[in-house]
UniProtKB/Swiss-Prot annotation:
Taxonomic classification: Bacteria, Pseudomonadati, Campylobacterota, Epsilonproteobacteria, Nautiliales
Family annotation (InterPro entries): DapB_C (IPR022663), DapB_N (IPR000846), DapB_N_CS (IPR022664), DHDPR_bac (IPR023940), NAD(P)-bd_dom_sf (IPR036291)
Record localization: Cytoplasm
Organism in which the protein naturally occurs: Nitratiruptor sp. (strain SB155-2)
One biological process term in Gene Ontology: diaminopimelate biosynthetic process
A GO molecular-function descriptor: NADP binding
Entry protein name: 4-hydroxy-tetrahydrodipicolinate reductase
Function recorded in the entry: Catalyzes the conversion of 4-hydroxy-tetrahydrodipicolinate (HTPA) to tetrahydrodipicolinate.
Length: 254
């Protein structure tokens, strides 16, 4: 059996990872990391707030936490490498660099969204962006009121695919807010906007707008189970890979 360590076991996705692995025929939860003060019982698994224990008892680690939590994990993994699947969004440049450095020692799979639908949507966005160069691009994402980072990592990934398809630098063309007398919209800019409310799991709309017509590509997640199942699939695939940095597209063969 593949021993899976869950980093962030008390979180929304972490709890679903535990549930989905309970009856898995290939992998099992061997250890769960939670913050100090949090009590959690997982039959057959060690529950700890020590990162080193998590690493020691895992064949592969799945991480769905916050950027600062992921940073702490990466720092310890650089000393004791183990395959890592991470879905934490909102990572800064330093944290991204730590992940890239770890990938030189062990296989690392990072994805801002683990769903098959989003993996395919990225491809559709790239093709549409390239073919419809005269169309304005606007991206709107909706999530629950508790999500801390904005825009979502998935929205930024979709924007990156759209920008690259047109040979643009996203950092130079992204607009994430409009207010006041700002003048006309430039042809190259890509709008990325975030809505927050209720218990929305996740909805992303990428719109391509022109005079007289428009196309909108939508993806709606109705359950976080899709993220948990995608991460488990990724973990099973990752353990047989060579050291390197991978995405969910690699796992799915896209």
């Amino acid at each position: 059996m593949l021993n899976v360590g869950i980093y962030g076991g008390s979180g929304r996705v972490g709890s679903l990872l535990i549930k989905n692995l309970q009856h898995d025929e290939v992998a099992r939860v061997s250890v769960v990391h939670v913050l100090k003060g949090i009590e959690l019982a997982v039959p057959g698994a060690t529950v700890t707030n020590d990162i080193d224990t998590l690493i020691q008892k895992s064949d592969v680690i799945i991480d769905f936490t916050l950027p600062e939590g992921t940073e702490s994990l990466l720092e310890r993994l650089l000393e004791h490498p183990k395959p890592l699947v991470s879905g934490t969004t909102g990572l800064n440049k330093h944290q991204q660099n730590l992940m890239q450095t770890l990938a030189q020692k062990t296989p690392v799979l990072y994805a801002t969204n683990m769903s098959l639908g989003i993996a395919l949507l990225k491809r559709l966005v790239a093709v549409t962006s390239e073919k419809l160069r005269d169309f304005d691009i606007e991206i709107v994402e909706m999530h629950h009121r508790y999500k801390k980072d904005a825009p979502s990592g998935t929205a930024l990934t979709l924007a990156e695919f759209a920008a690259k398809a047109r040979g643009l630098d996203l950092e130079k063309v992204r607009v994430s807010g409009r207010d006041g007398n700002i003048g006309e919209r430039s042809k190259e800019e890509i709008g990325v906007f975030a809505l927050r409310g209720g218990d929305i799991v996740g909805r992303h709309t990428v719109g391509f707008y022109n005079d007289g017509e428009y196309i909108e590509l939508n993806h709606t997640a109705t359950s976080r189970d899709t993220f948990a199942k995608g991460a488990i699939k990724a973990a099973k695939w990752l353990v047989s890979q060579e050291p390197g940095f991978y995405t969910i597209d690699d796992c799915l063969g896209l």
